[in-house]
């Protein structure tokens, strides 16, 4: 793609029909904001030459894409799509663009291949836009043609058969290709003389036709992938289509997915050929499942890594965690951000880890909390062990040495260290460091007293 072509995403609207406090483009699909799907479709074609117009709750959009190389333009007042283009014009010109493709931020089904096709078909046009023919055009803008040639785009609420003739079934998808030199003279001529009182980008078409510019309406049949998402029902339908598309792609790539209709996978997740997934299961964010790893049913993963030969058993919850090779997790385990399992480590049922590391071969079989902890290779953590890491103000670390054995129902009050090869007796409350190769017992002596007989 020529370096003088860029893209503009319109994402400033409120999306009132979503009945949500957050902007429409941040509604989630497969754990990701809807806007991300549009950005991902454009990136292979335009690289970093993509701008997004934001307005309503722009702060939330900035936060959602913090740390990413996204370019934003602010539309302080949401006065329509034409006004949004005007707000972005200086940025587009400063980037040295000759052409710009304009898309709406609520089209998560948009495919890269569609954009490639559109650019080739519109190469000679001053203004081009994509159209669909629908049995029920609904609220979409109508495409008016005279003798097959585009005459105008008229918004549904403004359509007047006395002026334009019988209402057509061909609609505007909201995807445009604009030659900047041609459009620059038209932008100041946009008006808000319509029922919405907004400046429509669609009015550029009528102005261009009147100016005898080359205007093309490129027909794309009845492709539903080009339609926007306007309400919760449409969001759910789009998510279902995207879920199926992604799951099928992984299966065709060599991933074994059982009950695929119940599996949800983020577009940013990586699942290597030879991995095995059992549904229902949810894999979100930048999670990575390596070849030979198995994730069982009813698991939830976000930004987690599972290396080859590892098994995540049912009902486990992993977020921001790393599971090394040959590990076992669960069932019913929770690995929170910063949890790391080195090779052949094991975490069993009802074990929670946070900012904690189990080195090679270490294991915590059940009913344990390991927070802000480092557990040495081969250590064994007994049932009911708790690292008491919070003193009410600050978090503190617990270090358990290689080969150590922590007896059941032990409380390790951080900061504290248990040395290599040491044993802590069951039921202990450890508040002081335990030297290497030591036995530590910190509990009250058992007393047996005679029991009074019942009266």
Curated annotation (Swiss-Prot):
Active site: 366 (proton acceptor)
EC number: 2.7.7.23, 2.3.1.157
Main location: cytoplasm
Coiled coil regions in record: none
Entry GO terms, CC: cytoplasm; membrane
Pathways involved: Nucleotide-sugar biosynthesis; UDP-N-acetyl-alpha-D-glucosamine biosynthesis; N-acetyl-alpha-D-glucosamine 1-phosphate from alpha-D-glucosamine 6-phosphate (route II): step 2/2; Nucleotide-sugar biosynthesis; UDP-N-acetyl-alpha-D-glucosamine biosynthesis; UDP-N-acetyl-alpha-D-glucosamine from N-acetyl-alpha-D-glucosamine 1-phosphate: step 1/1; Bacterial outer membrane biogenesis; LPS lipid A biosynthesis
Residues annotated for UDP-N-acetyl-alpha-D-glucosamine binding in this entry: 10-13, 24, 75, 80-81, 141, 155, 172, 230, 336, 354, 369, 380
Residue numbers spanned by region Pyrophosphorylase: 1-232
Entry keywords, A to Z: Acyltransferase, Cell shape, Cell wall biogenesis/degradation, Cytoplasm, Magnesium, Metal-binding, Multifunctional enzyme, Nucleotidyltransferase, Peptidoglycan synthesis, Repeat, Transferase
Record: residues binding Mg(2+): 106, 230
Region described as Linker: spans on this chain: 233-253
Region (N-acetyltransferase): 254-455
GO biological process, any: lipid A biosynthetic process
Molecular-function GO term, any one: magnesium ion binding
CDD domains named in the record: GT2_GlmU_N_bac (cd02540), LbH_GlmU_C (cd03353)
Subcellular location, record wording: Cytoplasm
Free-text cofactor note: Binds 1 Mg(2+) ion per subunit.
Residues annotated to bind acetyl-CoA: 383, 389-390, 408, 426, 443
UniProt subunit comment: Homotrimer.
Family matches, as HAMAP family: GlmU
Function statement: Catalyzes the last two sequential reactions in the de novo biosynthetic pathway for UDP-N-acetylglucosamine (UDP-GlcNAc). The C-terminal domain catalyzes the transfer of acetyl group from acetyl coenzyme A to glucosamine-1-phosphate (GlcN-1-P) to produce N-acetylglucosamine-1-phosphate (GlcNAc-1-P), which is converted into UDP-GlcNAc by the transfer of uridine 5-monophosphate (from uridine 5-triphosphate), a reaction catalyzed by the N-terminal domain.
The name this protein goes by in its record: Bifunctional protein GlmU
Organism: Nitratidesulfovibrio vulgaris (strain DP4)
